[in-house]
């Protein structure tokens, strides 16, 4: 609800309207291609929505998921069928892959499923090249994987290199130098064809400070949370935890990490059975290598360019190998299924017993005051998961005891059981997730999904709005500019700006009400407060606003609406400047309190030293005696900026246009994130864009009336 649906709508409408350059609806503004290539632009499923009207997009999410799961089953089959004797066995493996714990866990992130779909094709093309020297297919699949999602492509490259060289070392494959160079050429050509999306994506992502946080020290050798090891182990034996509500290991700090690898019905029985065979098969070694990589932090992070953030978003590739091991075990008469079922049952029961019955002692002043049993956070859900795993183990045992006599009967019975388990555990997972979120019929369906059509405010498209403790990205879905945004990929200048005033900005922009000067600087005119929750912007009686200068305007569309009396229109001028060094000397503030830097931005534009020299004579340096800031002076600064603000402002497909009246040559500031690709014209003449106020842009406008800026 908070990312995928709004992103689909923004990108869909941008493509249909030709607004492919700059998205003013994403945070404070963002490069459209760079910000949405990770989520949507490379996905063929997104492009299928383009012919449909914008109002239908939320209703297409379900059909698109059906198509994605079907496609993952198909591509899984394309890879697996080479290794099986029977098409039905390959079909079993493809269903295991498509409905693995990783796929179900990541229903929340529906853009992850494109990687799940296309990756088997790249391995299948590599297999075809190595077996039959069929050329061209590998280049096409490399292009597809890179084009669809560059982030997952990094992990796919790591995996494919391990897969390729391990099979060479195991003598499963042989290749001449000439054929190797031709294969490498295909890989290069595939990446080259994907550069149309890859280059703008890289240019955007490299601005994000999160990409430069490399794993190091002891954190590269051992996980700093010991519960994470158990979380990794249990994800192979149990259905996946909810992304936001880890249950088995509540303190593993693995929320949203995509820790899911359970194979429906079979779990680890087929994998353990295959690993117990005394044969030197490449797949056996591959699985051991992958399990080791999952347990060693720096090896795990090699699937994401050694980034220090913990994610297991490469496990779909591991589940493909696990599905392959399972189907190969099904066709190998030497596999001791009784032994593998016993091992799986023992490990599953051990994990359940430790987490479900381990006592916790509570002491006060050295005296025992309480004893609780169980380490899980949600006992009912935990024991349901245990029951699902145990029932599946029992079902596998039943299939081998009573259905093994006829291969055809066994395969049909297995497919029926596998399909039932896949459907019901998926429904259970989704249903549990819905119980952890708001009741959609109270607010989301009647008010959020209507696009704000019942709200009639005159300038929603030319100013910014704020949403107080409301559903993330509501403004995106309504398609109005806002300072609130749950979006990971935004210009580096946005992150630099928020960092300079102490507001955290990692995956979302959510400045708290303590930062009221920020609202004026970024031209926030309206605030929407959900009237269906207990988080009141001004208390239940609506008489104590959380920020100064806000007045109640009315109620519409399930929201109390507040108006900012300190609103400054987009595009305004200054009389003073503050050097970056002097700005840095002011107090920064933090997440819950505003420092002096924020109100200082309303009194003086912040300039770098080279910009000060270039704009010499245009502005005066802010005097020392004017560097004290109060709530009263804040209101006066807003009034001063409002006196010399643009008389009109409108967004266009290429950026924005504005009009201003100036009494002299002035620097006009816009709270639009600076990017190197911007160009500007004033009265039709090209002008330089200045990078000011820690990441925003400004242009010099001459004296005159109705000065045009675009």
Tell what function each PLM region has.
Residues 1-73, 95-116, 205-210, 218-262, ...:
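Membrane-interface coil-to-helix junctions
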Residues 2-11, 44, 179-180, 187-277, ...:
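Periplasmic/ER-lumenal interhelical loops and adjacent helix-loop junctions
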Residues 35-38, 418-444, 453-524, 563-637, ...:
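Extracytoplasmic/lumenal acceptor-recognition loop(s) of multi-pass membrane glycoenzymes
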Residues 66-82, 87-169, 182-202, 207, ...:
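Membrane-embedded helix bundles of polyisoprenyl
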Residues 72-79, 118-130, 158-166, 267-272, ...:
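Transmembrane alpha-helical segments
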Residues 133, 152, 282-449, 703-710:
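Contiguous transmembrane helix-bundle modules in multi-pass membrane proteins
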Residues 172-181, 270-294, 406:
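Membrane-interface helix-loop-helix junctions at transmembrane boundaries of multi-pass membrane enzymes
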Residues 619-710:
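Active-site-proximal, structured, solvent-exposed surfaces of multi-pass membrane proteins
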């Amino acid at each position: 609800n908070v990312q995928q649906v709004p992103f689909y709508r923004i990108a869909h409408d941008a493509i249909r309207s030709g607004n492919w350059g700059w998205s003013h609806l994403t945070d404070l503004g963002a490069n459209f291609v760079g910000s949405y290539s990770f989520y949507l632009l490379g996905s063929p499923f997104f492009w299928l929505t383009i012919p449909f009207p914008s109002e239908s997009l939320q209703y297409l999410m379900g059909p698109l998921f059906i198509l994605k799961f079907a496609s993952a089953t198909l591509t899984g089959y394309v890879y697996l069928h080479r290794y099986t004797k029977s098409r039905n066995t390959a079909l079993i493996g493809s269903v295991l892959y498509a409905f693995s714990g990783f796929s179900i866990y990541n229903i929340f992130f529906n853009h992850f499923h494109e990687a799940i779909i296309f990756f088997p094709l790249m391995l299948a093309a590599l297999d075809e090249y190595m077996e039959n020297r069929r050329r061209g297919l590998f280049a096409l699949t490399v292009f597809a994987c890179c084009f669809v999602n560059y982030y997952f492509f990094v992990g796919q490259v790591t995996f494919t290199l391990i897969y390729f060289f391990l099979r060479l070392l195991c003598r499963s494959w042989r290749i001449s130098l000439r054929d190797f160079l031709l294969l490498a050429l295909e890989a290069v050509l595939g990446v080259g064809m994907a550069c149309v999306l890859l280059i703008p994506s890289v240019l955007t992502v490299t601005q994000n400070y999160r990409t430069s946080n490399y794993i190091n020290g002891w954190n590269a050798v051992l996980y700093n949370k010991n519960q994470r090891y158990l979380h990794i182990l249990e994800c192979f034996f149990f259905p996946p935890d909810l992304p936001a509500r880890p249950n088995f290991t509540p303190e593993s700090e693995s929320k949203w990490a995509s820790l899911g690898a359970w194979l429906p019905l079979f779990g680890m029985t087929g994998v353990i059975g295959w690993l117990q065979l005394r044969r030197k098969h490449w797949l056996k070694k591959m699985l051991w290598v992958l399990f080791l990589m999952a347990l060693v932090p720096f090896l795990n992070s090699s699937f994401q360019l050694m980034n220090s953030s913990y994610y297991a978003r490469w496990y779909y590739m591991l589940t493909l190998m696990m599905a392959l091991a399972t189907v190969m075990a099904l066709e190998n008469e030497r596999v001791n299924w009784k032994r593998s079922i016993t091992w799986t049952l023992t490990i599953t029961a051990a994990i359940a017993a430790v987490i479900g019955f381990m006592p916790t002692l509570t002491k006060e002043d050295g005296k025992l005051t309480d004893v609780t049993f169980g380490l899980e956070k949600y006992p009912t859900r935990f024991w349901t998961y245990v029951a699902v795993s145990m029932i599946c183990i029992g079902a596998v045992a039943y299939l081998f005891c009573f259905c093994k006599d006829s291969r055809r009967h066994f395969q049909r019975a297995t497919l029926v059981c596998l399909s039932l388990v896949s459907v019901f555990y998926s429904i259970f997972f989704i249903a549990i997730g819905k119980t952890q979120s708001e009741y959609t019929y109270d607010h989301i369906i009647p008010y959020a999904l209507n696009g704000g059509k019942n709200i009639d405010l005159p300038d929603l498209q030319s100013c910014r709005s704020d949403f107080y403790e409301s559903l993330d990205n509501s403004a995106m879905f309504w398609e109005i500019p806002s300072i609130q945004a749950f979006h990971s990929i935004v210009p580096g200048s946005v992150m630099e700006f928020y960092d300079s005033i102490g507001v955290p900005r990692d995956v979302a922009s959510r400045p708290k009400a303590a930062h009221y000067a920020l609202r004026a600087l970024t031209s926030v005119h309206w605030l929407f407060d959900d009237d269906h929750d207990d988080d009141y912007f001004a208390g239940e009686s609506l008489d104590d606003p959380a920020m100064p200068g806000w007045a109640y305007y009315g109620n519409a569309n399930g929201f109390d609406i507040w108006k900012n009396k300190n609103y400054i229109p987009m595009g305004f001028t200054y009389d003073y400047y503050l050097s970056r060094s002097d700005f840095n000397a002011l107090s920064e503030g933090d997440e819950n309190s505003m420092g002096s830097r924020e109100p200082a931005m309303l009194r003086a534009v912040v300039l770098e030293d080279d910009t000060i020299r270039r704009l010499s004579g245009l502005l005066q340096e802010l005097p020392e005696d004017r560097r004290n800031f109060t709530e009263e002076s804040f209101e006066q600064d807003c009034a001063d900026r409002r006196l010399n603000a643009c008389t009109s402002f409108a967004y266009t497909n290429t950026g924005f246009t504005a009009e201003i009246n100036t009494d002299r040559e002035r620097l006009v500031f816009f709270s639009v994130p600076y990017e190197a690709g911007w160009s500007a014209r004033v009265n039709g003449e090209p002008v330089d864009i200045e990078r000011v106020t820690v990441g925003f842009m400004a242009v010099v406008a001459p004296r005159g009336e109705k000065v045009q800026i675009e």
